[in-house]
Amino acid sequence: MKSRTIWTIILGALLVCCIAVAYTLTKSQAGASSSGESIATIGGKSVTREEWLKEMEDQYGKSTLEDMINVRVVEQLAKKNKLKISKSEVDREFLLIKAVNNSFYEDEHTTEKEWKDQIRYNILLEDLLTRDIDISNKELESFYNKNKELYQFDDSYRIRHIVVKDEEEAREVLKELKGGSSFEAVAAERSTDRYTSPYGGDLGFVTEASDNIPSAYIEEAKTLKEDEWSQEPIKVSNGYAIIQLKEKLKARTFSFDEVKDQIRRQIAMDQLGDKATVKTLWKEADVSWFYGEKSTK
């Protein structure tokens, strides 16, 4: 399983978890309310709370329960098999997500802790699924030597930017920021970059080798401390910009010994192919559930 695919799965899992939590909270909060309560009217006709909750359960009930089962299955079997994941292992994979894959975004819905919890879950799941697969040290070293770019990164800067049409407006932006306005809010309101403005101007982690990033951004970022923004407008091809440095990561290369367990899981998961799914563990965990027969086939 390719590295970028793994992070896509993590991203998808986090999204599903957000939906599941929202659904569970909504249903629990509604427990004390009347099921016949009208929560909306359309042309004089009501939508009742009961109808709404049924629709929510039809759409999310099965997937929510399945996610809850999956987490418990992995936790129980990991404990049974005495699998333990170190904090350093989770931190390393999280660092690679940020710097190499540029996939990390933290917002009000998904925090750094939630990312790390999902990474820990994925590592445990992959360890369980691949526990009976042996990969020689020679094969692991060969993979590492052929794919070193997956385990190293240059100095990286997580940058936000606000792009406006002219220098005058850029200076107005600076006044707003100095007056206490948040960078994210001003970016959402003023930036002409429609791809990043909904995300507070977040460009993710960039390096000197990044495509489509003005070299002036990198040079300015080198002079800034985290959370500081540029004090003068930066001339760019489509106007003027103000940037903010959110985080800086120093260049690093992980050694073979540091990542060999991760490589073993990657190769073993590739060998499993479509069989690499948590549902293959349900029978071992003796699962029975509302939507199906006991355990799975």
Curated annotation (Swiss-Prot):
It holds the Pfam family Rotamase_2. Keywords: Isomerase, Rotamase, Signal. InterPro entries: PPIase_dom_sf, PPIase_PpiC, PPIase_PpiC_CS, PrsA_foldase, Trigger_fact/SurA_dom_sf. GO terms for molecular function: peptidyl-prolyl cis-trans isomerase activity. Gene3D superfamilies: 3.10.50.40, Porin chaperone SurA, peptide-binding domain (1.10.4030.10). It catalyses: [protein]-peptidylproline (omega=180) = [protein]-peptidylproline (omega=0). Residues 1-32 form the signal peptide. It comes from the Bacteria. This is Putative peptidyl-prolyl cis-trans isomerase YacD. It comes from Bacillus subtilis (strain 168).
